[in-house]
Amino acid sequence: MSPKILISGPPRSGKSTLMKMLTDYFRKDYSIVGFLTPEIRKNNKRIGFDIKSIDSTIRFPLARKATIVDTHRLGDYSVFVEKFNNFIEEYLENKIRDFGTPNESHILFIDEIGKMELFSNRFEIFIRNIFRLDMSIIATIGKNLSHSIRSYLMNLPEICFFETSIDIQRDIFNEIVKNFS
């Protein structure tokens, strides 16, 4: 069975940094696909998040601090669900199909399974389906996420769960790498 890794931790605990370290490490020996959600900052203040493909130049806004009509809202953020749905359909689902039969040389990275991303029903369905495949997955999940997808994933027998913090980031990196050797 291919490794399925979930990484959790409070905001600013280094989850996304750990994912970046892992994509950089695995890129040389594996076919990797997926996305990161880098913070967007202006004048040292976070103004939003982007979706950034890890194997192409695709990048677009996931959320911005603004009131925009016809968007989902999470706190001060407007979330661009339609753009994310298009990304899932036109990029992620196609990339997984292009892999053909998933094998040990493929890894899917998902940063993150969180409240903003789960405004997309398509994303929830994608997550439920992809975790059923024999495919290696490394994903972050919101620590305080109260959504049925969290309990679904945490109850899968093949899940290897890590809770990170800045202090133990390197140790977790090493443990995750061991899962692939």
Name the predicted role of every residue range.
Residues 18, 22:
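Hydrophobic positions on the alpha1 helix immediately C-terminal to the Walker A/P-loop
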Residues 15:
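Conserved lysine of the Walker
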Residues 11:
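The conserved Walker
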Residues 4:
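Walker A (P-loop) ATP-phosphate-binding motif of ABC ATPase nucleotide-binding domains
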Residues 69-129:
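Phosphate-binding/switch loop-helix module in NTP-utilizing enzymes
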Residues 24-73:
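N-terminal phosphate/diphosphate-binding loop that engages ATP/GTP or pyrophosphate donors
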Residues 7:
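Hydrophobic anchor at the beta1->P-loop junction of P-loop NTPases
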